[in-house]
Amino acid sequence: MTIDYENAWEEYAKKWQENHPELTHIGDEWIGKAAGAANSLAEYEKLIEQKFIAPYINEKHTVLEIGIGGGRTAELLLKYCQKLICADISNSMLKATKNRLGETRVKYLKLDGITLNGIDPKTADVCFCYDTMVHLEPRDIFNYLTKIPAKLRGEKICIFHHTDTLSDLGWQRFLKDWDNNLMGKRNGTAHSVMTNAIMEKFLSHLKYKIIHQDTDSVPRDCIWICQAPDII
């Protein structure tokens, strides 16, 4: 299978303003409606903040966010954390986020899609990955899960969000674009085929401690709160 995540999101960014002339920030078009979570951007941001940020992140934390889009969740994270590392495979997404947030308390890092090189060991207290793994193939998710623990310190809290193809809304999403992703090729912005059982197997195999599994807040998807292992 060939997936060019980087080019897919660069192309998305190029066409974004034309496709969403009413919006100021890229990423604000993702309001959670198709996922069954919300009906407006404000409602979706409130859900993310109250359910997945406020309970786990405080003013002493450095947060590593993998997959930042246009900085929507990064802006929410900055309300709670001390420092934020914004890591993304797309230069355009990094630029859009920097324009939105500036550089105070924020570091920006271009990812290669395989490693987390450029992030020093034991740099962050929390890893936050929301609206990103929904696009990643299972093997790519597993790969990141093997790389994250070395970058964390302290309680090593992780918030991971992925799609569940077997949920009712996940299946609707699958039926929407399956025929555009054939012959071993898939657009990097499409949703992957992923399930909660696969993610649980990944986490358990790698010795992550599962704290909470949430399949209610975002009915199409699944969000895991877990603690990364010391060593993989």
What are these regions (language model features)?
Residues M1-K60, I66-D120, L136-N143, K147, ...:
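Class I (Rossmann-like) S-adenosyl-L-methionine-dependent methyltransferase catalytic domain
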Residues F128:
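A conserved beta-strand element that flanks and buttresses the S-adenosyl-L-methionine
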Residues D131-T132:
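Short catalytic micro-motifs in class I SAM-dependent methyltransferases
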